[in-house]
Amino acid sequence: MKAEIHPDYHNITVVMTDGTEYVTRSTWGKEGDKMNLDIDPKSHPAWTGGTQQMLDRGGRVSRFQKKFSGFLK
């Protein structure tokens, strides 16, 4: 491997939506930073059976629904 081309790999703290924290290694951020998740396996509709409502970030979900609204009719 070439030296000095890979990003720094360090410990960060990941905070789940329910407040649970765990430490993992990542290239994201700096040593000791906290990554707060908006969606995780405990709240994502794909893993919860769709009981949670999806957040529409920047109108992407509504644009998708509008574009494909008549697809299965």
UniProtKB/Swiss-Prot annotation:
What keywords are annotated for this sequence in UniProt?
Ribonucleoprotein, Ribosomal protein, RNA-binding, rRNA-binding
| One GO cellular component, as annotated | ribonucleoprotein complex
Where in this protein does the record put region Disordered? Answer: 34-54
Q: GO MF annotations for this entry?
A: rRNA binding; structural constituent of ribosome
Pfam families in UniProt: Ribosomal_L31 (PF01197)
A GO biological process this protein is involved in?
A: translation
Q: Which cysteines are joined by disulfide bonds?
A: none
InterPro entries, sorted = Ribosomal_bL28/bL31-like_sf, Ribosomal_bL31, Ribosomal_bL31_A, Ribosomal_bL31_sf
Residue stretches of biased makeup (Basic and acidic residues): 34-43
Tell me the subunit arrangement.
Part of the 50S ribosomal subunit.
Q: Describe the function of this protein.
A: Binds the 23S rRNA.
Q: Say which family it is in.
A: Belongs to the bacterial ribosomal protein bL31 family. Type A subfamily.
Q: What is this protein called?
A: Large ribosomal subunit protein bL31
Source organism per entry reads Rhodopseudomonas palustris (strain BisA53)
Q: What is the lineage of its organism?
A: Bacteria, Pseudomonadati, Pseudomonadota, Alphaproteobacteria, Hyphomicrobiales
